[in-house]
Amino acid sequence: MHKIPKGTALAFDFGEARIGVAQGDAELGLSHPLATVTGGSNDEKFAAIAKLVQEWQPRYFVVGLPVHTDGTKHEMTHLSRKFGRRLNGRFNLPVYWVDERLSSVYAESLLSEAQVFGKKRKSVLDQVAAQAILHGFFEGGPAECFNGREG
């Protein structure tokens, strides 16, 4: 268990091609899909993220940390950590990494129940996965905080 920080959060489901983004507030117990950042260079992706940061004024970030179902590191684990450190470096906000093992499965299931398919599904899948990551964080799942210092 971890103490849930107060205030607005932005959560990220990081991928090399697409980054799903969700927004929420633990005090209200609400989170919602927000955007999918796609294509372009890292600078272009971070410019799009900067616009979301400007608009939503988060107090912290939550980044999904991919691991295999048995808990071992995934090939994307290192890249997600690097992404989180870059968020911290660019915006000087704490980053909480959370296990995202089942976020995509949850997102797929939710979208199937809502009968969202095809191009629409692809456009929102990463956002809904980010929402699942944020919801898990709000529910008190295990998290690791990074605030600009390796330790």
From Swiss-Prot:
InterPro entries, sorted: RNaseH-like_sf (IPR012337), YqgF (IPR005227), YqgF/RNaseH-like_dom (IPR006641), YqgF/RNaseH-like_dom_sf (IPR037027)
Matching Pfam families: RuvX
Gene3D superfamilies registered for this protein in UniProt: YqgF/RNase H-like domain (3.30.420.140)
Record has Nuclease as a keyword: yes
GO cellular component term of the entry, any: cytosol
Main location: cytoplasm
Localization in the cell: Cytoplasm
Keywords for this protein: Cytoplasm, Hydrolase, Nuclease, Ribosome biogenesis
Any GO molecular function: nuclease activity
Single Gene Ontology BP annotation: rRNA 5'-end processing
SMART domains: YqgFc
Catalytic activity, EC: 3.1.-.-
Broad class of enzyme this protein falls into: hydrolase
Family per record: Belongs to the YqgF nuclease family.
Record function comment: Could be a nuclease involved in processing of the 5'-end of pre-16S rRNA.
Name the UniProt record assigns to this protein: Putative pre-16S rRNA nuclease
